[in-house]
A protein has these predicted regions:
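Conserved acetyl-CoA-binding loop-helix of GNAT-fold acetyltransferases
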Residues: 54, 60-73, 99-100
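A short, internal acetyl-CoA/4′-phosphopantetheine-binding micro-motif in the GNAT/acyltransferase core
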Residues: 29, 52-60, 87-88
Length: 144
């Protein structure tokens, strides 16, 4: 898998332990090298993609897409109704990338209590509410 140091740069060790214990962490390998990972968390009937990362050298090879599909399969296997994530609006390719995978932006008026909590935590980390958006997809969504 990815080195602890590489993973620590993104999620804290404690969060990592939690993700591992909840079975919500997958590491993608390419030619036996760690190439990316996805960390998920289950909230009631939904699966939240907390982070998805592909190392720069392994970009544009379908790894991110495969990791998202893995999370959607997990949600389906758990009988959950949806998968959601939060992403930066200003990164040009973000929204279209997730839309191709069946995600649609969620208006603030439709946020759940869990989404509100996630945003509050992000704000404590210094992330600006309006620069990011939630996107969600049905777990049953058939992806091409």
């Amino acid at each position: 898998g990815m080195t602890a140091e590489q993973l620590e740069d993104t999620l804290s060790g404690e969060e990592l332990e939690r993700a591992l214990s909840e079975g919500g962490l997958w590491i993608a390998e390419w030619a036996e090298q760690p190439a990316g990972f996805i960390a998920t968390h289950r909230y009631q009937e939904s699966l939240y993609i907390r982070e998805v990362d592909v190392l720069q050298d392994y970009g544009r090879r379908g790894i991110g897409r495969a990791l998202i599909r893995q999370a959607m399969s997990q949600a389906k296997a758990l009988g959950l109704s949806s998968v959601f994530l939060r992403t930066f609006r200003e990164v040009e390719w973000n929204t279209p990338f997730y839309e191709k995978l069946g995600f649609t932006p969620i208006a603030e008026s439709e946020w759940t209590a869990v989404m509100e909590q996630i945003v509050e935590v992000e704000e404590e980390w210094g992330l600006v509410r309006d620069r990011r958006q939630f996107m969600a997809a049905g777990a049953h969504h058939q992806m091409v």
